[in-house]
Structures are given as C-alpha cells and as structure tokens.
C-alpha cells in the first residue's frame, strides 16, 4: 500500500516551522510522507499564527481554497482530512469548528503530539476533534527523535511567556513559560549533529528566559546551555531567537565573549523607541536599559549586530514617540527587522485602549520606518564587500555550480563552489552586495576562520551607547 500524503503550511514564527517539522515526525510512523502541494494530500495541516489579524484571517481564506480539493477527493472515494493547528487553533478553536465545516481537527500548539490519536478518531467516524488543552505532561516527552534535514535545524528549548505585553496573545495561546530539561536538549542536539546538522537555532517565545533543570538538579540559564551545546561534536554554530531584553543576563553576555560557536547576531525586539509607549506596552524596560544591553553585548563582541521587532501605530503613539523610534534605529543600526502596523488582538489589554490610530497614519509610519531600515541594511551589506567570513552552505543555487549559504549575520551568500561542500562551513571573501544578499568567492583555508569576528568598518558605525 502506498504511503499517505501529508501537506503542512506554516504561518508566522520560527517556532511554527519547528512545530511543523515535529508534526511530520509524529505522523511519519503512520506512513505519512510530506508533499509540497495540498491537492491530493490525505492530511492537510494549517499551522497558524495569531499575532496579527491579517495572519489569522488568512487561515479562513486558505480553508476556502482547500474545499475544492477535498470535494474532488471525496468524489473519487478518497478522504482528505483537514487540521488547523497553532495559535489560531488555540485562541479560536470553537469558532473555527463552527465557521469552517471543512475542518476535521483543531489542534492547539501543546497538543500536536496527539495527532495520531485524533486522526484515528476521525477516520473511524467518531466525529470532529477539538484538542486545545494544555497538557499536564510536556508534549516533548511524547515526541519521536528529531530528523535532520540539511545542515541547519531548529531546536525548541523554551515555550510560553510570562511577560504579558499588552499587545500580545502569546501568553494566552502558548501558556506559561516552560523550559525543557538540559539533558533532553543536549540529547536532541547530539542527534541532530550526528545527522549532519552544523548550525542549531535555539527557539523559544522568550528563549533567553530559559531555566532548564540539569541532571544534578541545578538550574541552567541560556548561557550555560550554549557552552554545553558548543562542546557537542559537529556543532559549529549556535543561534537563538526570540529573546527579551529583560532576560539578557551577565552569563549570557559572557557566553557571547567566550563561545565561538555563538554567532555575532542577536534578534532582540524593542518594539518602540519611546519610554511612554514601552510602558503602555508593559515591556518591563525603558530605552536607556535597552541601550545598556546593546552596549554590553557589543563590548563582548565588537562585530555584534542586531535585528529587532517594531510595532508602529500603537494606541496613543504620537509623532514624537515615532521619531524616538527612528532615532533608536539610527543609533543601534539594526541590520534586519520585522516591522508591523499595530493590530488589535481580541482579549489583549491594548485592544481596549481608546486612542487607536487611523490606518492611514499607521501605514505612513510603517513605510518611513522600513525605508530607514533598508538604508541601514544596504550600508551594512555594502560594507561586507572585500571581507572574509565563513558561510554555512545549505542549498544549491539557481545556476549550475552555484551554492547558497548564510553569513554569521544571516545574509544569504551566493558563490560558485563544488557540490561536495554542501553542508559545510566554507571560507569566502565577499565580492559584491545587494540590499538583500551577498556574492562571494571561495578561498583556500581552514573553515574555522576567525574572520567571522570581522565587522565591516566601512559601514556607518553603530553609535557607541552610554553605559
């Protein structure tokens, strides 16, 4: 009997990408193979995001597109099962079931290890399934060993959030902060490395709030965990996301100084450059505190660069508040960023605020902010020209003889290289740059080049920040 087909579409964050991979791992023993198209799939999973209204509404649009596929399969005597997973499922599960009859299963982000049971229940005619309970025992205890798919992999070490920013649904959809035990993380990382993974990105809603229990009963923070992961044979690079400024501690900063595998690039969301707006968001820090963290991290590694999240048009944001955000962007010189118009999320405190801004004003501010960010990104990329760096080659390029990889700062790098180098860290020198990527040539030498610690001097320098 031929294996069944599984199609998964993920929306939103890297955690959803990780979760999608683990769903595939859960279903693989039942004979489900991943496919790239929903048409003809036996099981379709929409792994959803609830951060913004647009992302949530897109789920219903995609469900409408699935209907003809499901009906066509039914006409052939076959059955397509449709599951909605992720944060929309958690927040709006009952509404999904009522509004979209095409949906067979609604699966919360802490329940997808039970997918095989849900599928079996639907297949035996026991009705549709809604499972959005937060389990007493962590889902990780029930997941199979991870499968390596290429030289880079995500590894979830922390989930949930206790911060309760006024704009955010994550505490309600992902639950309280939970850190996986140290031994489990190290075991999973070792399995990935044995499968050829060279770069591991540690994931968490607040990943640097990690406080996992070690075998001796002590609690490890993210810095100590990074040191242990770097000792695993084969692990050449470590990244982590998403971090919160409140959880950047002394040991994590020291780890960036001491652990060569930790890349000099941190996603550290600030959301706004205005103290007034940060307080309204309940972020738990002010702009000066954020500056001090940036300054300390740059003191640990002088090639450190940053990305961030920005929300424009938060309720009550004045033009002065917005200009303060632009000033912080100019000061820190973020080389990447995710930026959005404020989107009220039902049930969050900010949604009830009266000073909501007009959409036109939010749009104009977003355009201005993104233009400023693009200028900085272009300058950073251009300043990399002529510089040596190590690139993790992770996929073939568009042209014959071309490979594509990632720089330490996450820029895509294109170069001519033999296919045998796929999956390795290769020493290169950057020859040209665009706003989005770099082109480089392969050079002779050891792939563990220290040149990853070079920050392009020709770029407009990041402002030194007051201690």
Swiss-Prot record:
| Subunit structure, as described in the record | Monomer.
Residues that, per the record, bind [4Fe-4S] cluster 1: 13, 49, 87
Question: Binding residues for [4Fe-4S] cluster 2, per the UniProt record?
Answer: 161, 165, 168
Q: Which organism is it from?
A: Rhodospirillum rubrum (strain ATCC 11170 / ATH 1.1.1 / DSM 467 / LMG 4362 / NCIMB 8255 / S1)
**Signal peptide positions (record):** none
User: Which controlled-vocabulary keywords does the entry list?
Assistant: 4Fe-4S, Cytoplasm, Iron, Iron-sulfur, Metal-binding, S-adenosyl-L-methionine, Transferase, tRNA processing
| Function in brief | Catalyzes the methylthiolation of N6-(dimethylallyl)adenosine (i(6)A), leading to the formation of 2-methylthio-N6-(dimethylallyl)adenosine (ms(2)i(6)A) at position 37 in tRNAs that read codons beginning with uridine.
Note the NCBIfam families from the entry: miaB-methiolase, MiaB/RimO family radical SAM methylthiotransferase
Subcellular location(s) per record: Cytoplasm
* Any Pfam family the entry gives: UPF0004
Molecular function GO terms recorded: 4 iron, 4 sulfur cluster binding; metal ion binding; N6-isopentenyladenosine methylthiotransferase activity
Enumerate the cofactors the protein uses: [4Fe-4S] cluster
> By which gene is this protein encoded?
miaB
Which InterPro entries does this one have? Elp3/MiaA/NifB-like_rSAM, Methylthiotransferase, Methylthiotransferase_CS, Methylthiotransferase_N, Methylthiotransferase_N_sf, MiaB_methiolase, rSAM, rSAM_horseshoe
Q: How is the cofactor bound?
A: Binds 2 [4Fe-4S] clusters. One cluster is coordinated with 3 cysteines and an exchangeable S-adenosyl-L-methionine.
Q: Which GO terms describe its cellular component?
A: cytosol
Record's catalysed reaction(s): N(6)-dimethylallyladenosine(37) in tRNA + (sulfur carrier)-SH + AH2 + 2 S-adenosyl-L-methionine = 2-methylsulfanyl-N(6)-dimethylallyladenosine(37) in tRNA + (sulfur carrier)-H + 5'-deoxyadenosine + L-methionine + A + S-adenosyl-L-homocysteine + 2 H(+)
Entry similarity comment = Belongs to the methylthiotransferase family. MiaB subfamily.
Where does this protein chiefly localize?
Answer: cytoplasm
TRAM domain residues are 382-444
Q: Where is the MTTase N-terminal domain?
A: 4-124
- The Enzyme Commission number assigned here is 2.8.4.3
Q: Which residues form the Radical SAM core domain?
A: 147-379
| Descriptive protein name | tRNA-2-methylthio-N(6)-dimethylallyladenosine synthase
């Amino acid at each position: 009997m031929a294996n069944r087909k599984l199609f998964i579409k993920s929306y939103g964050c890297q955690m959803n990408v990780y979760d999608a991979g683990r769903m595939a791992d859960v279903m693989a023993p039942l004979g489900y193979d991943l496919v790239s198209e929903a048409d003809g799939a036996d099981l379709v999973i929409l792994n959803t995001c609830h951060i913004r209204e647009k992302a949530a509404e897109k789920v219903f649009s995609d469900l409408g597109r699935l209907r003809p596929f499901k009906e066509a399969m039914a006409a052939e005597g076959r059955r397509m099962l449709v599951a909605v997973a992720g944060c929309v499922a958690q927040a709006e599960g009952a509404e999904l079931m009522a509004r979209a009859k095409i949906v067979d299963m609604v699966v919360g982000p802490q329940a997808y290890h039970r997918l095989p049971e849900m599928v079996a229940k639907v297949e035996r005619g026991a009705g549709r399934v809604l499972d959005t309970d937060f389990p007493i025992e962590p889902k990780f205890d029930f997941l199979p060993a991870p499968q390596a798919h290429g030289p880079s992999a995500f590894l979830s070490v922390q989930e949930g959030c206790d911060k309760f920013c006024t704009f955010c649904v994550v505490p309600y959809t992902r639950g309280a902060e939970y850190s996986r035990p140290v031994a489990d993380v190290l075991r999973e990382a070792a399995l990935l490395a044995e499968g050829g993974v060279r770069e591991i990105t540690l994931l968490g809603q607040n990943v640097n709030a990690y406080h996992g229990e070690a075998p001796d009963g002590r609690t490890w923070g993210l810095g100590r965990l990074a040191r242990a992961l770097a000792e695993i044979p084969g692990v050449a690079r470590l990244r982590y996301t998403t971090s919160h400024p409140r959880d950047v501690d002394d040991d994590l900063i020291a780890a960036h100084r001491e652990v060569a595998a930790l890349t000099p690039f941190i996603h550290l969301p600030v959301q706004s450059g205005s103290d007034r707006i940060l307080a309204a968001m309940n972020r738990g820090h002010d702009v000066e505190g954020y500056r001090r963290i940036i300054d300390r991290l740059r003191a640990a590694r002088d090639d450190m660069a940053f990305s961030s999240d920005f929300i424009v048009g938060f309720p009550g944001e004045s033009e002065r508040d917005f200009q303060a955000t632009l000033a912080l962007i100019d000061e820190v010189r973020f080389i990447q960023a995710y930026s959005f118009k404020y989107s009220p999320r039902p049930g969050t405190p900010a949604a009830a605020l009266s000073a909501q801004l007009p959409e036109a004003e939010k749009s104009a501010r977003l355009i201005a902010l993104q233009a400023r960010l693009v200028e900085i990104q272009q300058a950073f990329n251009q300043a990399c020209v002529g510089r040596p760096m190590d690139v993790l080659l992770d996929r073939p390029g568009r042209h014959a003889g071309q490979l594509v990889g990632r720089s330490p700062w996450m820029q895509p790098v294109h170069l001519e290289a033999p296919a045998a180098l796929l999956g390795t860290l290769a020493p290169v020198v950057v020859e040209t740059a665009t706003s989005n990527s770099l082109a480089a040539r392969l050079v002779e030498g050891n792939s563990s080049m220290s040149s990853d610690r070079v920050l392009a001097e020709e770029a407009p320098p990041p402002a030194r920040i007051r201690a």
